[in-house]
């Protein structure tokens, strides 16, 4: 059971339908304790061939529709935004998957930002060095931005990282568990 001030932050695919078009997004949503939508962020930097098919419209126009048959690309979000949770009095920058790897592109109202949340599905790396490399970028961004990073990775490394890149709490990819963040500065 959720408490009154609890919030749920999770990754989910969302669909927006306007007039005669529909778009699918890789999204992070924030829900209140009654599961009402507080805020959402749609991923901007999409993974080629994983989240979108490059040249999909071109292939369709020249008669190679079979290449993209049954495939519906994600749409890119429009802008990065700071998410504010008023009843918790905190603000965070949402980053989905590999958006965390881009240096120098996060700074968004830095003085108002308490931390960065990065959610990721690292299962596509398989049994490789990939999840560890991806996780390392979370530490780099914490240091670069001078912010705490909360990273939740399905089939990857989850962690709470200090602004100096120190791992406060970590769950390896094979571990099940919860990282509870009680406070931050």
Regions found by a protein language model. Give the residues of each.
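Enzyme catalytic cores with a strong preference for nitrogen-chemistry domains
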Residues: 1-185
């Amino acid at each position: 059971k959720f408490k009154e001030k609890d919030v749920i932050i999770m990754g989910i695919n969302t669909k927006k339908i306007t007039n005669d078009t529909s778009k699918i997004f890789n999204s992070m949503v924030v829900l209140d304790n009654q599961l009402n939508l507080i805020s959402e962020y749609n991923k901007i930097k999409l993974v080629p061939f994983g989240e979108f098919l490059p040249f999909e419209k071109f292939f369709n126009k020249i008669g190679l529709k079979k290449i993209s048959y049954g495939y519906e690309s994600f749409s890119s979000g429009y802008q990065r935004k700071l998410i504010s949770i008023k009843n918790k009095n905190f603000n965070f920058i949402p980053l989905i998957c590999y958006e965390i790897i881009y240096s120098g592109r996060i700074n968004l109202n830095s003085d108002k930002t308490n931390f960065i949340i990065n959610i990721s599905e690292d299962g596509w790396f398989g049994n490789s060095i990939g999840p560890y490399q991806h996780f390392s970028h979370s530490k780099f961004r914490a240091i670069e931005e001078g912010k705490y990073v909360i990273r939740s990775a399905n089939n990857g490394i989850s962690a709470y990282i200090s602004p100096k890149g120190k791992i406060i709490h970590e769950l390896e990819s094979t571990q099940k568990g919860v990282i509870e963040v009680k406070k931050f500065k």
